[in-house]
Amino acid sequence: MTIMRKKHPLIKIINHSFIDLPAPSNISSWWNFGSLLGLCLIIQILTGLFLAMHYTPDTTTAFSSVTHICRDVNNGWLIRYMHANGASMFFICLFLHVGRGMYYGSYNMIETWNMGIILLFAVMATAFMGYVLPWGQMSFWGATVITNLLSAIPYIGTTLVEWIWGGFSVDKATLTRFFAFHFILPFIITALVLVHLLFLHETGSNNPIGLNSNADKIPFHPYYTIKDLLGAFILLMAFMILTLFFPDILGDPDNYTPANPLNTPPHIKPEWYFLFAYAILRSIPNKLGGVLALILSILILAIMPLLHTSKQQTLTFRPITQTMYWILVADLFVLTWIGGQPVEYPFTIIGQTASIAYFAIIVILMPIAGMIENNILDLN
């Protein structure tokens, strides 16, 4: 078996990725989220496949087909709620995974990091289009509002929006193409994940102290296979509690009303995992400015390697930058809360302050903190 594992053209790739892979001996549970994201992706593809068997991407029947899945299909309610809440679990793992990368300076592995940013954009696009498919009120108006933002692009904006809509409003053509894209994107994401792993295995994993761990490596199996399995069980436990006991807690009640172009919901807001970006978008009174801020809120991750001023890679031994980091985390919670509130005083001013703080901490305060720490430790 050993010979087969190491010699077979296909199996040896798996062997070098998950079995005989040399891994640092001290990586903590923060390194579990990569495998958990893989698990989330598999759950989403499988549940999505079964939903697609019963779903009809047509404005007249989409809402009814989702109702039909929940009422008439064997365990359809479970598949539907697993898919909806699976997206939430996916984003929780994503945010923790990115947060881990920021804390431990993993952005210095530039190819892996940039691939991760592309993956983040792809997952966000997939989730947005998936939210449109049930064709409830929030689906329809969310699609209308977000696609409409592209009209802020000078000169080609309006043409671009109508091209994406396939008409003069969000309608049958829009729903059909969103379903097509929503179906294909997870497979593209799977391919990108393999590239992400390919880049990661060029350098090997980072570790909590940020030092080179080549002198002290252990095989991935059994040490990290069993550790990942424990993480998977904890995730599945939380996931099933959410799905079976509180399936609608993260959803919007408005989406149980069929889409009606003649009736606008009082508060149009996206799913919770987009609220921080939505708050940043709304905090700028100019349409184009808001769109740019929205894109930059994620794209800013790409310049993190350039903003790294410290002589140490991780934040493990850097209390000043640590403080900045946790203020940033708190700021993201504030933005998430504001994104779900109506546009009125005092929420607007809180949102603007939190948006400024978000960019200021990443671009100004954390790099300065790194330089101060270098001076304190006399590392210059």
Swiss-Prot record:
<comment type="similarity">
    <text>Belongs to the cytochrome b family.</text>
</comment>
<feature type="transmembrane region" description="Helical">
    <location>
        <begin position="288"/>
        <end position="308"/>
    </location>
</feature>
<keyword id="KW-0830">Ubiquinone</keyword>
<dbReference type="InterPro" id="IPR016174">
    <property type="entry name" value="Di-haem_cyt_TM"/>
</dbReference>
<protein>
    <recommendedName>
        <fullName>Cytochrome b</fullName>
    </recommendedName>
</protein>
<feature type="transmembrane region" description="Helical">
    <location>
        <begin position="33"/>
        <end position="53"/>
    </location>
</feature>
<feature type="binding site" description="axial binding residue">
    <location>
        <position position="182"/>
    </location>
    <ligand>
        <name>heme b b562</name>
    </ligand>
</feature>
<keyword id="KW-0812">Transmembrane</keyword>
<dbReference type="GO" id="GO:0046872">
    <property type="term" value="F:metal ion binding"/>
</dbReference>
<keyword id="KW-0479">Metal-binding</keyword>
<feature type="transmembrane region" description="Helical">
    <location>
        <begin position="178"/>
        <end position="198"/>
    </location>
</feature>
<dbReference type="GO" id="GO:0005743">
    <property type="term" value="C:mitochondrial inner membrane"/>
</dbReference>
<dbReference type="InterPro" id="IPR036150">
    <property type="entry name" value="Cyt_b/b6_C_sf"/>
</dbReference>
<dbReference type="InterPro" id="IPR027387">
    <property type="entry name" value="Cytb/b6-like_sf"/>
</dbReference>
<dbReference type="Pfam" id="PF00032">
    <property type="entry name" value="Cytochrom_B_C"/>
</dbReference>
<feature type="binding site" description="axial binding residue">
    <location>
        <position position="196"/>
    </location>
    <ligand>
        <name>heme b b566</name>
    </ligand>
</feature>
<dbReference type="Pfam" id="PF00033">
    <property type="entry name" value="Cytochrome_B"/>
</dbReference>
<dbReference type="GO" id="GO:0008121">
    <property type="term" value="F:ubiquinol-cytochrome-c reductase activity"/>
</dbReference>
<dbReference type="InterPro" id="IPR048259">
    <property type="entry name" value="Cytochrome_b_N_euk/bac"/>
</dbReference>
<keyword id="KW-0249">Electron transport</keyword>
<feature type="binding site" description="axial binding residue">
    <location>
        <position position="83"/>
    </location>
    <ligand>
        <name>heme b b562</name>
    </ligand>
</feature>
<dbReference type="GO" id="GO:0006122">
    <property type="term" value="P:mitochondrial electron transport, ubiquinol to cytochrome c"/>
</dbReference>
<feature type="binding site">
    <location>
        <position position="201"/>
    </location>
    <ligand>
        <name>a ubiquinone</name>
    </ligand>
</feature>
<keyword id="KW-0679">Respiratory chain</keyword>
<feature type="transmembrane region" description="Helical">
    <location>
        <begin position="113"/>
        <end position="133"/>
    </location>
</feature>
<keyword id="KW-0999">Mitochondrion inner membrane</keyword>
<comment type="subunit">
    <text>The cytochrome bc1 complex contains 11 subunits: 3 respiratory subunits (MT-CYB, CYC1 and UQCRFS1), 2 core proteins (UQCRC1 and UQCRC2) and 6 low-molecular weight proteins (UQCRH/QCR6, UQCRB/QCR7, UQCRQ/QCR8, UQCR10/QCR9, UQCR11/QCR10 and a cleavage product of UQCRFS1). This cytochrome bc1 complex then forms a dimer.</text>
</comment>
<feature type="transmembrane region" description="Helical">
    <location>
        <begin position="226"/>
        <end position="246"/>
    </location>
</feature>
<comment type="function">
    <text>Component of the ubiquinol-cytochrome c reductase complex (complex III or cytochrome b-c1 complex) that is part of the mitochondrial respiratory chain. The b-c1 complex mediates electron transfer from ubiquinol to cytochrome c. Contributes to the generation of a proton gradient across the mitochondrial membrane that is then used for ATP synthesis.</text>
</comment>
<keyword id="KW-0496">Mitochondrion</keyword>
<keyword id="KW-1133">Transmembrane helix</keyword>
<feature type="transmembrane region" description="Helical">
    <location>
        <begin position="77"/>
        <end position="98"/>
    </location>
</feature>
<dbReference type="InterPro" id="IPR030689">
    <property type="entry name" value="Cytochrome_b"/>
</dbReference>
<keyword id="KW-0472">Membrane</keyword>
<dbReference type="GO" id="GO:0045275">
    <property type="term" value="C:respiratory chain complex III"/>
</dbReference>
<feature type="binding site" description="axial binding residue">
    <location>
        <position position="97"/>
    </location>
    <ligand>
        <name>heme b b566</name>
    </ligand>
</feature>
<dbReference type="InterPro" id="IPR005797">
    <property type="entry name" value="Cyt_b/b6_N"/>
</dbReference>
<dbReference type="InterPro" id="IPR048260">
    <property type="entry name" value="Cytochrome_b_C_euk/bac"/>
</dbReference>
<dbReference type="InterPro" id="IPR005798">
    <property type="entry name" value="Cyt_b/b6_C"/>
</dbReference>
<feature type="transmembrane region" description="Helical">
    <location>
        <begin position="347"/>
        <end position="367"/>
    </location>
</feature>
<keyword id="KW-0408">Iron</keyword>
<keyword id="KW-0349">Heme</keyword>
